[in-house]
Design a protein with these regions (language model features):
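Active-site-proximal, structured, solvent-exposed surfaces of multi-pass membrane proteins
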Residues: 176-413, 418-421, 456-457
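Hydrophobic, well-ordered secondary-structure elements that form the walls
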Residues: 46, 62, 111, 315, ...
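Long, low-complexity, intrinsically disordered segments
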Residues: 420-457
Length: 457
């Protein structure tokens, strides 16, 4: 019924926002992102921790990001995001779930938020405008860094692990440093729990119950954060920096969360950062399709780039093209020997040249057909010189079609139908065999004459 449909739509429908609401923070975000770009000319990425409108905010505000929504998004990246506790789906992946570790690995140097965040040695305030704030992540790696070759091939992150556990495995594999995230406590069945931090530090939560879609976090009964749409993702919740004197309350309206609590070990994190940064790719020049820089490797290693793997990327080491491959089926990677090297990355879409050639040929053919048709209609071209197929395509009736009509008009009397009164049982009049044979013979003679003329030509 109409009433039932209306109630269902109200309960399950997807809401929309007004243009005024959608553009409410546009000028403020443009202001803070421009302030950053005016003062920092290096390569960096930035993303919104709180206040994002969509996965494509980076495209909207013209800043580089680790989020995207696209029907052709990289499946390997989406799977990697799932493993390390970041937002992902079939046709999108996003920054929700970023940690200090993934900020560093993915070159996310700046974080945008429409809420004030607690500062720490890891992240501090940079600029703000009209309710939009930018924080600088102080330990961000360049777009590429050297890793052990065995890591590039042998790393295994388990699907049944939460994102924090897999990030611990990842950092241990890349640097040899274990437990960058320190397990604090867990709440297997509680829907409402109170966390007392064991020490001051950056806190992260992992919700294992897949039926929980929304979690509310309140710090010291004053500051409240709500995290939505976590049901379909193996997502990490970034609570921010908390002190050991703080009280953190976590609640869910849908039952037990199976909540795990972790704290970032800053000393281990900084050691891991320094190890990777000591053999990182120093970018000298870059554009949307090209990077130029140097890297010094202490031994034979692999360079891992925080760039989604694509066949369009080519890597040149000391002027020679190197073989590229996909690390974890997601990121661009290339082997490099010990020593200091000039490394150049170039991007050109796969089959771009072939596509341009085919497009150009098609345009030429279409122009040719159009011009030929114009000349024919103007009577400047004799159609007799064209093959029969082309003539038919250009709407010039063949001789056979012409003579069928002519002979039919000459031999079928118009009075035949007039003599018939029963139109409900209309039947074709009988035409004697002699007339039929005459028609067929005439058609064959004309086709033979036409073929002889074309042969002579």
């Amino acid at each position: 019924s109409i009433i039932e449909c209306t109630l269902n739509m109200d309960a399950t429908g997807i809401g929309t926002t007004s243009r005024t609401s959608y553009l409410l923070d546009y000028d403020a975000v443009k202001t803070v992102t421009k302030t950053v770009s005016d003062n920092d000319t290096s390569f960096y990425r930035m993303d919104k921790l709180f206040g994002a409108r969509s996965k494509n905010d980076g495209a909207w505000h013209n800043y580089r990001t680790v989020s995207t929504f696209s029907s052709t998004c990289n499946a390997g990246m989406s799977k990697l995001y799932n493993l390390i506790g970041m937002e992902n789906s079939t046709n999108a992946y996003g920054c929700n779930g970023l940690t200090a570790v993934t900020d560093s690995l993915f070159s996310v140097k700046y974080t945008i938020s429409n809420r004030l965040l607690v500062e720490s040695d890891i992240r501090n305030y940079y600029t703000g405008s009209d309710g939009e704030f930018v924080y600088k992540n102080n330990y961000t790696l360049p777009i590429g860094y050297a890793i052990n070759s065995s890591t590039a091939y042998d790393l295994v992150m388990a699907k049944n692990n939460n994102g924090i556990e897999n990030q611990n495995l990842l950092i241990q594999s890349l640097t040899g440093i274990s437990d960058v995230f320190e397990y604090t406590t867990s709440f297997p069945t509680e829907a409402d729990c109170i966390i007392t931090p064991a020490k001051s530090g950056h806190m992260y939560l992992s919700v294992a119950n897949k039926s929980v879609d929304s979690v509310t976090v309140t710090i010291n009964n004053t500051t409240t954060y709500t995290y939505n749409n976590i049901k379909s993702n193996n997502r990490i919740l970034d609570i921010g920096y908390v002190h050991d004197t703080d009280t953190v309350e976590v609640t869910s309206d849908t039952g037990g969360m199976n909540l795990s609590v972790y704290t970032l070990d800053e000393d281990k994190f900084i050691r891991a950062y320094n190890k990777l940064n000591s053999e990182s790719y120093q970018v000298e020049k870059f554009s949307d399709t090209k990077f130029t820089g140097t890297l010094t490797a202490s031994s034979d290693k692999a360079i891992l780039f925080s760039i989604p793997y694509d066949g369009g990327w080519s890597v040149y080491i000391d002027g020679k093209k190197a073989d590229t491959y996909a690390w974890e089926n997601a990121l661009l990677c290339v082997d490099v020997s010990a020593g200091t090297h000039t490394v150049v990355l170039k991007y050109r879409p796969v089959n771009l040249i072939l596509g341009c050639v085919i497009t150009t040929l098609c345009i030429i053919i279409l122009i040719g057909i159009y011009l030929a048709n114009c000349f024919i209609k103007a009577g400047k071209v004799n159609m007799a010189y064209f093959p029969l197929v082309i003539r038919k395509y250009l709407d010039d009736p063949s001789l056979t079609d012409k003579y069928i009509k002519k002979l039919s008009d000459d031999n079928i009397e118009s009075s035949i139908l007039d003599d018939m009164d029963d139109f409900e049982n209309l039947e074709s009049p009988d035409i004697d065999d002699e007339l039929t044979d005459s028609l067929l013979s005439s058609i064959e003679d004309e086709e033979d004459n036409f073929n002889e003329e074309n042969t002579d030509i």
